[in-house]
Regions:
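Amphipathic alpha-helix face/heptad-repeat signature
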Residues: 355, 359-362, 366, 398, ...
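Basic, alpha-helical terminal appendages of large translation-related enzymes
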Residues: 1-4, 44, 68, 120-125, ...
């Protein structure tokens, strides 16, 4: 059976409403998942919420409600937003789910039985915000703990620890032998440097005396699981991992069909959680090297180069943006105006500019003028593919320009198809090629001047060639832009009157990368009438 392409995002902490960073990551994963489905692959996309931990418990207490009610209310906001933004996932991961709880408890019990977890006393400074003890490495040059740690207090506490150091050399060797483990590659270098400095073990418990909202340890009911150990395990708990089976090769087939995963995460949670703790946890559970996950590490959306934060009051709300401009406008901006793996500045003005220039003025205009001309000049028929009239109906230079532009446009089908076929993570590159193609199609209209060709019967073949070239370009562009703009892709197909079978309406099965080959639009195809697909976003003179 073919291997499933399994991808995950970080699960979002339910102590507050979703922000633009959450939306970017989930849309990025959604677009990557849709590209793989477009190629005919089986895809499993997992996302969800992290519902345990001290911050959740404190927020619930502040709100005067039970933790479960609090996380349920926050979770509903995330689910509603992903639905609004057309994020299509295959499984929802909530860490209060009994399936997850059972898996976490089973993993911890097994590691405890294998002496990989031990109990010890720790004394030192504790970050309430980050829910961890701090060491001198976390102090700034002045010897103080920075504001990122929030409230810091001195504590003495007994807890359970997971052994990290015995796996340090293995992880170093693995990372050096697998240079493609982390994308972009400079993040892998950072991870290796961090692993070289690794010391100490990981505290994986919290006493119930100060934190009751968590998954209880089976071997000591006075403790709950540390939120990071709990959260990381979701990547295997929701796809059928059985912690009672120590051999990976004996795991259920439903799990082995999916694993290993591609983890799509922000740069702030690669080190140490995902890049060090998680591989070591898997190694301790007996996962072989070839079954280690890969990581796509994305950057942040900033405001004027500074990180968004609640304290600065500059957090961007994706829900209100989607209401204001539409989900497709937001999806397009977030995918086109950032290089995957790097940071970018969020500007509402840029969102409007890119939508109006790339979609309303370029792609939308191309669709409108193509269908209008086909309707006006050929009663909606696309006759072709046609050829240039060999008779001297125009000046040699003019004829060469038209032929050249036709070749440019049809040739871009190969370029765009190749770009999308190999689409890994550089979504903005694919969008850039499609934008260039659309621009060249609009240039073809200006070069060919169909309104002149229709007046000369000897130029009928030229007109047919131009209209076919435009309609066929739109058909293929719709296929390739589907992952980023699913609703727009369906809209283009609808107006082209293409694949209109009722059972395909609104479904991804309507699109296939195999169909994105030049020449599949049949001679005599009847297109529909144009309706505005991308209404311009009008701004005030001051805006």
């Amino acid at each position: 059976m073919p291997k499933t392409f399994y991808l995950t995002t970080a699960i979002d902490y339910t102590n507050g409403a979703p922000h633009i960073g959450h939306a970017y990551e989930k849309i990025l994963a959604d677009v990557i998942a849709r590209y793989h489905r477009l190629k005919g692959e089986e895809v499993f996309y997992l996302t969800g919420v992290d519902q345990h931990g001290q911050k959740v418990q404190q927020s619930a207490e502040k709100a005067g409600i039970a933790p479960q009610q609090f996380v349920d209310e926050i979770t509903a906001k995330f689910i509603a937003l992903w639905d609004k933004l057309d994020v299509r996932y295959d499984r929802w991961a909530a860490t209060t789910d009994p399936v997850h709880k059972t898996c976490v408890q089973g993993i911890l019990q097994r590691l405890y039985d294998e002496k990989q977890i031990y109990k010890d006393k720790q004394e030192g400074y504790y970050s309430v915000r980050q829910e961890q003890f701090l060491t001198d490495k976390e102090r700034d040059p002045d010897g103080e703990f920075g504001p990122e740690w929030g409230q810091v207090e001195h504590r003495t506490e007994e807890n359970y620890y997971f052994k990290l150091e015995p796996h340090k050399e293995w992880l170093l060797g693995y990372l050096r032998a697998h240079p493609d483990c982390v994308t972009p590659d400079f993040r892998q270098t950072e991870l290796i440097n961090a692993d070289e400095k690794l010391s100490g073990d990981l505290c994986i418990s919290r006493p119930k005396s100060r934190l009751s909202w968590g998954i209880e340890l089976l071997f000591d009911s006075a403790y709950v699981t540390y939120v990071w150990f709990d959260a990381l395990t979701n990547y295997i708990s929701f796809v059928g991992y059985d912690p009672s089976i120590s051999s990976f090769s004996l795991q259920p087939s439903t799990f082995q069909e999916k694993w290993p995963a591609l983890h799509i995460i922000g740069k702030d949670i690669l080190i140490p959680a995902h890049g060090i703790y998680w591989p070591i946890m898997l190694h301790a559970l007996g996962f072989p090297d070839e079954q280690m996950p890969k990581f796509l590490v994305h950057g942040w959306w900033n405001i004027s180069g500074a990180k968004m934060s609640k304290s600065l009051g500059n957090v961007i709300d994706p829900d209100s943006l989607a209401d204001k401009y539409g989900a497709e406008a937001l999806r397009y901006y977030l995918m086109s105006d950032i290089v995957t793996g790097k940071d970018s500045d969020f500007e509402e003005r840029r969102l409007i500019e890119l939508y109006n220039s790339d979609l309303a003025n370029s792609l939308g205009n191309l669709l409108n003028r193509t269908l209008s001309m086909a309707g006006k000049y050929r009663n909606g028929q696309v006759l072709g593919p046609g050829r240039l009239n060999p008779e001297p109906g125009m000046a040699e230079g003019e004829r060469w320009n038209l032929g050249q532009q036709l070749n440019v446009v049809s040739g871009l089908a190969v370029v765009a198809n190749k770009e999308a076929s190999g689409a890994g993570f550089d979504i903005h590159d694919v969008i850039g090629v499609l934008n260039h193609w659309t621009t060249q199609c609009n240039t073809l209209v200006e070069v060919a001047a169909p309104w002149k060709l229709v007046k000369d019967d000897s130029r009928a073949s030229d007109l047919n060639a131009v209209l076919y070239c435009l309609a066929e370009s739109l058909r293929i562009i719709a296929i390739l832009i589907l992952p980023a703009l699913p609703k727009a892709a369906h809209g283009i197909f609808d107006q082209l009157n293409w694949k209109m079978e009722p059972e395909l309406a609104g479904k991804e099965a309507r699109f296939s990368l195999a169909d994105a080959e030049w020449g599949k639009l049949p001679d005599g195809h009847i297109v529909g009438k144009p309706t505005p697909l991308f209404p311009r976003i009008e701004t005030s003179p001051e805006g």
